[in-house]
């Protein structure tokens, strides 16, 4: 059975796979999961200068727990496996959102497998640089992109499925570097 992250208004009970009162239109009931690591990112500051560490979206700039990036592409942020992330996401401001699963500078030592994101207010899964691999990932009924890649993400995404909803934007958004570091994706 998966580990289910959902809003408090979901009437799902322990041992059940889903509740009965929420639909795919019920997004933004809570934030989302953010995993921040020390792998390489391609970012720049407000003056356009390269930086290897920056603040993740959705966390106040004054909070140092929101910093990610570094120089260790093999960084290990743990394991996220057999997880369902439902009815989350938040639009805080332009370019400042919380996705279902946000991965900032997460290294290849981290294991992410069998993750689904259902009915999220912004992107299903967003990678900000890093080198983590993600396999068996599903996003459905997201309000923006299914999978979004930024800041020279260099990991592999295998066995992924994106199912668009009525409010979805793109299945994939793949952006290049913000700084001068270029990685393959």
Language model segments and positions:
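Beta-strand/loop edge motif enriched in small/polar residues
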Residues: 1-185
């Amino acid at each position: 059975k998966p580990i289910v992250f959902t809003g408090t208004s979901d009437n799902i009970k322990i041992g059940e796979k889903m509740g009965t009162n929420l639909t795919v239109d019920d997004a933004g009931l809570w934030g989302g999961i953010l995993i921040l690591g020390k792998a390489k990112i391609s970012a720049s500051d407000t003056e356009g200068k390269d930086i290897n560490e920056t603040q993740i979206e959705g966390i106040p700039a004054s909070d140092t727990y929101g910093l990610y990036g570094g120089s260790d592409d093999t960084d290990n942020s743990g394991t996220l496996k057999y997880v369902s992330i439902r009815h989350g996401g938040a639009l805080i401001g332009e370019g400042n959102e919380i996705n279902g699963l946000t991965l900032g500078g997460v290294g290849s030592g981290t294991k992410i497998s069998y993750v689904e994101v259902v009915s999220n207010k912004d992107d299903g899964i967003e990678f900000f640089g890093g080198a983590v691999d993600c396999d068996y990932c599903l996003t459905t009924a997201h309000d923006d992109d299914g999978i979004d890649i930024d800041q020279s993400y260099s990991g592999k995404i295998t066995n992924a499925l994106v199912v668009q909803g009525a409010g979805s934007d793109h299945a994939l958004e793949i952006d290049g570097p913000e700084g001068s570091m270029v990685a393959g994706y």
